[in-house]
């Protein structure tokens, strides 16, 4: 009978989700939130009549109050920010809401297609993640931000170094709007990413430029630069190779003095990144 414990452990997530979990238990998203996504994905009406199951009298419940003289709704076309300083010749008008980094390989081809189709429909950008730029990112024509991690997937030599010629070919694509250098990530403090070899298909190996014989590991730091000043020159190099597209970097701030050293390098070299992405320590960008 003791062996049934292992069966129950296997079924535990499903039992909890279908029989125990309340509609508003958010771990990380509640059933109510997930249902809203499902219905909108199917273009179905997500409104429910006869009140709400939410306790609107609970502490810290936030709501919008009515006005007898409401403002005219803003034009969605104004919800954009121009990214690109004077050192960039192809600035990009970015939406204030976008799709942050998720790699092909970790996500399926259909998931990448769906995300990029959404970006195309909503006129916002889709960050590739460090797993390279795949054909599925390009299929529907949504704007792309190409994330470049320490593994240089999609633009690397056989020994894992940065290959400027391969980078230029991809970066010059009209659909690629910006380049993002990943320095660090909240979900992976102190080390690079890993894709187990069992998940590396022939297609993934070809897209990333890696072998299928072992796990695909991103180094903990970049080989193309070692110091903040070298990083600024690398940013300028990527700008030139991409024909003037915006180049920025992503980091999860650990020690404030390390970030200040990057700021000092900007002042010293007068090379200014076009944007900075701050990654949350809980893993959220």
Predicted regions and their residues:
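Conserved, well-structured core domains of diverse proteins
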Residues: 1-97, 101-120, 124-125, 132-141, ...
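Alpha/beta enzyme core
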Residues: 117, 133, 138-140, 159-285
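Glycine-/small-residue-rich beta-strand-loop submotif within the FAD-binding core of flavoenzymes
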Residues: 146-154, 203-209
């Amino acid at each position: 009978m003791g062996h049934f414990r292992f069966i129950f452990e296997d079924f535990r997530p499903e039992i909890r989700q279908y029989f125990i979990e309340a509609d508003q238990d958010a771990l990380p998203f509640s059933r109510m939130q997930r249902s809203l996504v499902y219905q909108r994905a199917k273009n179905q009406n997500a409104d429910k009549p006869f009140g709400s199951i939410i306790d609107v009298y609970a502490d810290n419940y936030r709501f919008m109050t009515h006005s007898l003289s409401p403002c005219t709704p803003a034009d969605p076309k104004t919800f954009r920010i121009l990214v690109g300083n004077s050192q960039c010749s192809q600035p990009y008008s970015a939406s204030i809401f976008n799709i942050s980094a998720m790699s092909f390989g970790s996500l399926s081809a259909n998931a990448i297609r769906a995300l990029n189709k959404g970006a195309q429909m909503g006129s916002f950008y889709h960050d590739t993640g460090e797993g390279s730029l795949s054909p599925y990112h390009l299929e529907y024509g949504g704007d792309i931000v190409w994330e470049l991690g320490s593994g240089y997937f999609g633009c690397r030599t056989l020994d894992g170094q940065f290959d400027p010629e391969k980078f230029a070919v991809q970066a010059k694509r009209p659909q690629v709007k910006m380049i993002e250098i990943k320095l660090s990530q909240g979900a992976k403090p102190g080390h690079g990413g890993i894709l187990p070899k069992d998940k590396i298909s022939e297609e993934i190996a070809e897209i990333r430029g890696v072998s299928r014989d072992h796990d695909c590991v991103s180094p903990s730091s970049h080989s193309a630069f070692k110091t903040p000043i070298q990083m600024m020159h690398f940013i300028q190099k990527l700008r030139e190779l991409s024909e003037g597209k915006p180049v920025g970097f992503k980091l999860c701030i650990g020690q404030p003095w390390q970030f200040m050293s990057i700021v000092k390098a900007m002042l010293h070299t007068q090379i200014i990144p076009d944007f900075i992405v701050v990654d949350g320590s809980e893993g959220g960008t």
